[in-house]
């Protein structure tokens, strides 16, 4: 190891950066080109950008941008009712929103406040027929990957959510 104090600091930081990028690459390779993803519209409101749209399975927000997500809305697939696909967001440590039925916005509409995490759950027929998972990146470089539906997705530091991906797949029978 070098005696240079800058090298002693930069080397661990660079190793961490490489590890984070490798995790993101693994997340992308798992979700890329999966023909069994169930399509549905997702709209996210991004700091200083506005609304961005995509489908379930797409990444929303820009990884590495430093811009946080302020809220989102999922329009469910045709065979899933709004009451069967619910989501909630983390607005701060120990501060969770109420469960929001799909089709409705969840977040800090008009307040420019960052989300610090989220959770998606299925119930009823949707839970019997589909499985949900998600991944996210945060403005501090934290990565959360392949979280099963119903579990909280947040950085240990409660850093603002920067980008996320939600997938919905038919259950294997």
Label the model's feature ranges.
Residues 1-173:
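Lectin-type carbohydrate-recognition ectodomains
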